[in-house]
């Protein structure tokens, strides 16, 4: 998969392109900031040390120092800004000292990476990502590019995510010129400008599609693909219509236009085995697996369909495999015909990629605080019920093997396991190692924090949202203008929950009350089962649900919740709630030039922070009593948030009237909700006191538990299982060299932006350095294992696992006969025969009712095997011996009491 393959590249910031005098000022600024940080730390330490008089003197001195440092920072920053402003547009050269390991970042496999032939075992210099801090420097880079190591680099594009984080992607100009037609299917900027231009930020986003993480679609055949018009219809319903001029809100019935295939197309069942997202030059979206060919034949519909250029196609005669829609082909109007695109696709060696394919098994998910905070009338009993799965999981971390290994991502459905995960699967006794125990303790604390901020395990799954494709085919091939489809208003179909009649469909970000409680038609056996044969959430073309969820269908997912308690609460809270509706602005076109692209980027960088709106809405939902003004404020902020999201394209943001601002500020001037201590690691002084809002109550309803890790169902951990030669003598020089390399890498890591990328780079470097010592790899691994697992019993082994984990796994496989496995009840190893349900011969003899959720334990008094609950770590005797023990203790206590009474007498 694309997310499993990545390449190391450099991620710089604008300081990497400073001239010498600018760099001198930058270093002076950095030094002043370090001094400021130290002064603040000293000031905090002084508050709890020294006598009163001496403490006041030292604090006063630190304040004077801070004042001088702040003045230096202001003056130096102003001088640097003036210097940069005088040099706007100058051509710059990357400073060689910027290309150091701390500036390594990783990029996933993509069409861009494949075109530039990036390699996974080196640091690639063909693509460089630049973080923007000063626009004056970025201006020159965008217009002129830069030079490094004798190569010219030019600005390529920025994805939506990179725009949010103020990043620009630069590539080697000579390579880009060579592969441009392959990336763009022959479309040039000159051609775009001839046809009137395009919105600059849309252009950047569409060009950046080739930088999406994808696998190459080897069997993609462009000759078996067509592009047709989207299905559009009118849906009548009640909405809260919001005016973006005067901010009035009116509940009214409206006929709303919907593009029912916005971002989604179809692929035959024999072409893809599940729904998947795809990318091609200027194309993106979701491909829904749907048997449109079988449906045409069964219904006797005409197989003739017209493409977006007016050419008719017989999808059966032409053996069409994939039908895309106009909304997926972003630059369709700049090609003369579909034939031209196909010819260019083949001529220039273009390719398609896919990503995020629907998994064979979808795990249950977690809620988040946004989904919970809009449920404003939840009782404590209901909250306890919702949190019960999470509480049980936290408790089971202490003693249940399955829960323990699942904390490391090891489940029966796990794929692409790393070395440590594979070792746990083969040798679960590894859970008793100090490193693993330390990780479990950290995981338990993290789970508690997650639970306190609303991340609760729920009976629900994330899955793609897809419109009723049967209705789409009725419209496309049956000629029905407004087809009925297989789903009516208020109905959905999700085959993941065939026994659940009602579902709550939610989506992030979840700002207003956006719980779409719908009837699940998968609970009824019908014709729908034949056509809706994937795990997606299918929605009706007569429903306002896509307006509630604020979704399109280009790969958007919904958390579909089937938990009865949650659905009941959501349905109750949605009484009287209707979708919000407002008219969004259109994005204007521009002639594309380097200056226009940079201006568009600056507007996107400075257009607004959507996080501010989300946090403001959280303040309102957690403010206490939810009044009418509170609800109105949430609606206004939701509208503002969506306009800010589109601001980079539309350059339009509504301005709230003063009276509206006053109402909103009455809520948003407060501090953040208390649970942000756990959700965003905020300090206590920056949040409100804990009140009785839904999410805030979780802290008191889920108390912290001090759990002692126990391993009652496993044999003792033996470090020799991880070794090839347990009798090896340790060379201290090997240990010293390894520790020196780890310490050096850790020091580099403290200044790195992308910690994971830097570590993976150093894992390879550490391994090569160790192998250069002259010992065989197996001997080096044995020495390290013996030292860190046996002699030192270290709690820090992440580098060892990521450097030599594959060798350790091979040793485990060699030392443990693969014909043996551990019994999931008693932990004993036994020989695997046929289907034994994971039980050894002794446990298979136990009664059926004891096989689920029970394990076998030996009574410490009589030695008899007894079945106890998996989570029970206290029982040590069978019931008969425990009763006898209680009698014995009672008799001893009675005897002691009588003795004390006689002495007192």
Write out the residue ranges for each language-model feature:
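Beta-strand-enriched accessory nucleic-acid recognition/scaffold domains that flank the catalytic cores
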Residues: 1-550, 557, 563-905
